[in-house]
Amino acid sequence: MQSTLRAELWDKLHFILGHSTDRMIRGELLYDGLIETGLLKKALLHVTETHPVLHSSFRDHFLYPYWEIRDYSIDDILTVTLTDDPGQVRDDFMNQVIPADCNVQYKAAVINHDGRSLLCVMLNHMCLDGRALHTFFYQIALCYSRVCEGLPLPVLETGSRAHSMIYSGLPFSDRIRARLLLRNITRLKEKRTFAYTREGPSDHLRIMRQKWEDVAYIKMREAAKRTGFTVNDMLLACYIQALSETCDFPAEKPLTITCMVDNRRHIKQSARIGLTNHVGLLQVRIDRYGSTIGDTVRRVHEVTTREKKKRFFGLQGI
């Protein structure tokens, strides 16, 4: 029986960046009724057993970091609370950090209040990216529904976590060229700085929230269709504009925002992949942020459109 898993590229990178981020992915889902805890436990256990990285400890070996598959119980993962203050319980749960050497790499909480359940989930970003998070939630929901209907648990999709899978859909010659890309190494003369300082004794986690109603997203999507911009362009432009104005960034200076690109587009369609990180870096560099948000969106759209046309889009900065 397999006892270890190889640490892939982004597993190690997220571990290294631990001095500047807490490495956690957090999500919550509010239900109209109450979640049946017994059914959820069966669903969580089935998903966890399908993906061994979820019950593994990261071992930072100086030559070959790896995951050690560990024993665990459902109590290591799930907590259930009945409360009159769901917001405080949620904040207490979400403000945790799962150590990389913990025996489980995600935790879930069911917070019951006034006949409704709030499902909070926190995962180690070393194990998976945003696209894989969708798969994770889908598989939990699928298993829960099957058990609720009295049906057997499904065989869940899983497979390789190997970083090299992102080249599997390319012809051999392109595969060689893509592996040799060094475009993430630049010779720009501007001063490059990292946005975060090292951890200090006075640091503490703080989660900033902004709730968007459906109508706001619908309006943004309609505006994107009308102008030819993507929703991602608009969200990125809003981030750049807000960051620049908040930090009093010099209006005449260029700035670069690093974004993540899903590289599953390059994976062979028939390939079976597990929960992992299959992303690349996209450097969105604009000469300056706009005098209006509309101007900034236009500048961002020009960059992203140009990058998407490149032969190895997403593979230059991994």
Can you say where each PLM-predicted feature lies in the sequence?
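Non-catalytic, low-complexity flexible loops and terminal extensions
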Residues: 1-10, 14-15, 127, 131-222
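Acyl-group handling in specialized metabolite and lipid biosynthesis
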Residues: 21-44, 67-89, 98, 124-128, ...
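Amphipathic alpha-helical recognition patches that constitute DNA-binding helices
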Residues: 39, 131-135, 156, 164-168, ...
